């Protein structure tokens, strides 16, 4: 996991998928549920593709398997809090294991 990068009220963090099955339906739903708790625009970028972090389908389309690296970008009032909570969720393996 890399250090959080800031740009005004925008924050970015590279994370690694740690759970055994990657980001499938349940982890994507948990990610979106967490993201939706905050007043922030959240985008996820993997292999040059950038999707809305509040979209379950978008997250699943990234095909982020175990060990995959992806970057979360957050901007807005709660951007830093959102990014910290998302990082915690990923580190907890999406509460699956």
What annotation goes with each model-predicted range?
Residues 2, 16, 55, 75-77:
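Intrinsic disorder
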Residues 3-5, 11, 56:
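N-terminal loops that bind phosphate or other acidic moieties
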Residues 8-14, 69-71:
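Intrinsic-disorder/low-complexity, polar/charged segments enriched in Ser/Thr/Lys/Arg/Asp/Glu/Gln
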Residues 16-57, 61-65:
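Compact, glycine-rich, soluble single-domain proteins
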Residues 65-97:
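C-terminal structural segments of small proteins and small subunits
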């Amino acid at each position: 996991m890399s250090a959080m990068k800031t740009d005004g009220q925008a924050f970015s963090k590279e994370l690694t998928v740690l759970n055994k099955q990657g980001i499938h339906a349940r982890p994507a739903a948990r990610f979106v549920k967490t993201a939706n708790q905050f007043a922030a625009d959240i985008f996820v970028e993997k292999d040059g593709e950038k999707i809305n972090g509040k979209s379950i389908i978008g997250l699943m389309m990234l095909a982020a398997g175990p060990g995959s690296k992806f970057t979360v970008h957050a901007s807005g009032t709660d951007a830093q809090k959102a990014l910290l909570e998302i990082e915690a969720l990923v580190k907890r393996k999406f509460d699956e294991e």
